[in-house]
Amino acid sequence: KLTVGAPTIHTVLAEAGKTIARRRNAPLTIIRRVVERLLSLNVMEVLTASMIKKNDKYTYVQGTRFMDHGARNYDVAGYRLPSVTTILGRTKDETYLRQWIAKKGKEEAERIKTQSATRGTSMHKYLENYVLGKGYEDLTELGQLTKHMAQKVIEVGLAPVSEYFGSEVTLYYPGLYAGSTDLVGIHNGKETVMDFKQANRPKREEWIGDYKLQAAAYAMAHDQVHGSAIEQCVIMVCTPDLYYQEFKIDGLNLRK
């Protein structure tokens, strides 16, 4: 009999291993029961089975985010700094955005914008709690959708991540800018700044210039304050229909 106190994939497999060792004459029966047990586990139980280790190599300070005249700013380490997103928003060409709003209509464009932001926040909550090894559940329709989006990111995007230095990390470049990145850790053996993004549809490389600039700015800030040598940035994108994409910035592209 398989006995599992707090069922997760790892506890089920561990118990199954012990049972198979005791009953070598009936492995197929046990394996079938293990598969049935795994299928009975919901996605939330998978989401709490984080295998990413905490590494305290870097010590991060917690910044306070505030709005000033509609712009996001940070109060961190004695500095009051504009956010990276605020700077990018004020310097980018908004021609396409204006055309999109004109095509969709102001009301519909605002609805899509709000929906996307809410979906992104929900997906981030699942991912943050997964990294920290905490349980999190949102039983709303939106929460159930973003649970599966987060699971896709975990299965594909976070699989190469062996350790993390910090989750939801406030980063700042003294006197210039600040921001919050989703994860800093070891990705495929390299110190990496990682950002999670939701998207309404798959992205093309040429559409994500701001994502790249944002991630690169975080890497520069990390190196400046913590004396690190961030080797790459990885941007993990997932759509509501679970299409996953990954964009990397490294080498000269990260430093230029």
Predicted segment positions?
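Extreme N-terminal basic, low-complexity initiation segments
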Residues: 2-9
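Alpha-helix boundary/capping motif
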Residues: 9, 20, 30-31
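Residue-level detector of structural "landmarks"
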Residues: 12-16
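Basic polycationic patches enriched in arginine
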Residues: 22-24, 32-33, 37
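Metal-dependent nuclease catalytic cores that hydrolyze phosphodiester bonds in DNA/RNA
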Residues: 38, 44-178
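Mg2+/Mn2+-dependent nuclease catalytic core
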Residues: 165-256
